[in-house]
Structures are given as C-alpha cells and as structure tokens.
C-alpha cells in the first residue's frame, strides 16, 4: 500500500546567495506537518545550453537581479497544480512542472523556480518518512562518500587576477575516509596560504573560497600547490592529486576557433590546446581536467579525448550542462569520460538523476558540483552519496556556504558508520590504472 504524503502547502521567497544576489528558496509542506526547504544556487560562468535562471530585470531592485517573478511563479502557477499530489511521486511532479513551463530551457517559469520546488518536494517526503535525504533518494545501497575536488586557487571569471584558467583544485586520493580527506585538504589549504605569503602574494579569497592572488603565469598556481602539498607532509600524486577547471569556453573565439589567453598574451589553436594540456599532465600530478576545450568545439574535444582520455578524467561541464541530449551526443562521439552534475543547469531532481544514470551506463564518471553563488543549502552533499557518484566539487574549506556541504558529508559518514566507503583513486573507475 502506497503511503499518502499529500502536499498541503508550497511557499517560495526571495533570499540572498553567497555573492549577495537574490535567489529562490522554497518550502513544501506534506500532510500539514512535514516541511522540506530548498534554496537554489547560481553560476558565474554559465554554459549557453543551461536552463534559464529567471531574473526580474528591474534595475531599481538588486541591479536587475531580483527573483520576485520566479517566486510568484512558484506561489501562483506551480503551487495550485501540485497541492494535493503525493510527494512520493517525484517524477510525476517534476514532469508536470516541465509541462507547465512548456519551453526547452525552462525560461517561462524559470529553472530557479522549478528546481526549488523539485528539491523541496524530495526533502519534505524524506522528512515525512523519517529518512535522511541521501537514503530517500538513493535507497539502501547509498554508501559511497565522495572524493572532494577542492578549489583552492582561483583565476578567470572567479577572480580579479592575472591567471586565465579558472580553478585549480586538489583531490585527496590517498585518504582512507572522507574525514581524513577533508583534513588533508584543509591542511594543504593552510600551507598554501603560507606559501603564497612567503612569495609576497595576497591571500584574499574568491567566490568559492579559494585564494585569488595576482600570480605571474598560468603555471605558477600548479607550482605553489605542489609546494603546499609537500609542506603539508603529503606526496603530490599519491596522497593528493591536482584537478583543473580552466573554463576554456570563456577563452574561445567561435569565429576563428582559437583560444585567447589574454592575461598570458597568447593565442592557441585547438591542436595547441591539446598539446598544452598533454605537457601539463606530464609535468604535474593532474588527474582531472574539466572543460579543457570549449563547449562548441566538438573537434577539439575529440582530439583531447584521444590524447588524454585513457590517462586522466576529462569532465564535461559547459559541454554537457547536465543535459541528457548533450550527453548522448558526447557519448556517441566518444568525447570526454565524465560529466559535471549541477542541479540548476537542468532544473529538476528527476532530470539530474537521469543524467547521472546515462553517464554511468556509458562508463562515464559523474562529479556532483556546487555553483559559485551558493547558499547554506546542503542538498548536493546528500545527492552525491545517494547516487554513489564518488566525487564532489564544492569549493575551498574557507566559507560557510562551501563548508556547510563538507560538514553535512562528515555527518553522513558518521551515520553510515562501518558501511561507509571512501573510494580514493577508485572514484576514477573508467581510467586505465597506472
């Protein structure tokens, strides 16, 4: 007999994200008693194929970034349709919202409106059943804690400095548990601060908590990270590896198919881009590169995958935008070997789970990710465990909006106890073991 968890109330409001911009928060009430609350994140470097985040455009309020229209869409359009539905029917509810919107990219109601409701429904159902969210979504086999892909140095759109590439991250692949992994990252982060200070650099942080110093080149961040790993007492590559998100779509000129490294003063062809990455991978303990070429450069992606696809993880973010149509094309063409999962790129929990399942069936890894504009919401921590993804990207250990996710993962690991699994290098299950 199916439990009846009737949705009895839905309420959206405008709140602030970690950058001081408005975002949508939604509360869904089940059986007049159990509440699920979710807040929606927002990106800075967004893929052109992403679902649309609805903003008011009224320059007199929050410089046009208000979300009152999205809030109104939840309260006046979505709420009347889903009140009375069973919160356990997640797929049906998500499908109904997609149909209510009626556009390819959720531009009518806004992906921020739809996602807020989608996640709040799942949380309300989990609370009503007395289950943690990861177990409600993932079932009895949800037990894999993720390897953090921790952003500790910023350039590009996430910082005001001389580095063209956007994110330099560390991955504690040699840890034995998530709590140990987190400690290794935090220690390296603190040692990196000292390394940067010793070189005369400032140690202010960017949107995602990583340092954003005015470094001299695109390679210097790698040098200082290796030094910090060693100073923390770890072996680069064995204990802690490096991951990159250069966000090259921001450097790409579609007209001539070239990449403009403005801060470095260099222009590279797609062939030179592949060569650039191959050389860096040979020189540094890099285990993952995200968006190594631009989202529309399918030819460049093919070349990059042929050159490095067996050696390291090649993650498609702007390339796939958590979208099954884009991912299906990538799988067919044999490009990349991993997908970045951002809930707000697609706009519902159901479509997110479909993208993860499609990736896994094709032998692609999935990396669950935050956005640069975050809140205290910790849904992605539960999601990454629910789907046994094995990797999470959610910033540095230095801002509450990022640390909230790590702290939730510590709680989940503690709750799982002896059944918790920390995959380490096995998170890269599709790579040829060195």
Swiss-Prot record:
Its cofactor is Mg(2+). Mg(2+) binds at residues 245, 290, 317. Its EC number is 4.2.1.11. Pathway: Carbohydrate degradation; glycolysis; pyruvate from D-glyceraldehyde 3-phosphate: step 4/5. It is an enzyme of class 4 (lyase). It catalyses: (2R)-2-phosphoglycerate = phosphoenolpyruvate + H2O. GO terms for molecular function: magnesium ion binding; phosphopyruvate hydratase activity. GO terms for cellular component: cell surface; extracellular region; phosphopyruvate hydratase complex. Signal peptide: none annotated. The active site is at residues 208, 342. PANTHER family: ENOLASE. Belongs to the enolase family. HAMAP family: Enolase (MF_00318). This is Enolase. It comes from Caldicellulosiruptor bescii (strain ATCC BAA-1888 / DSM 6725 / KCTC 15123 / Z-1320) (Anaerocellum thermophilum).
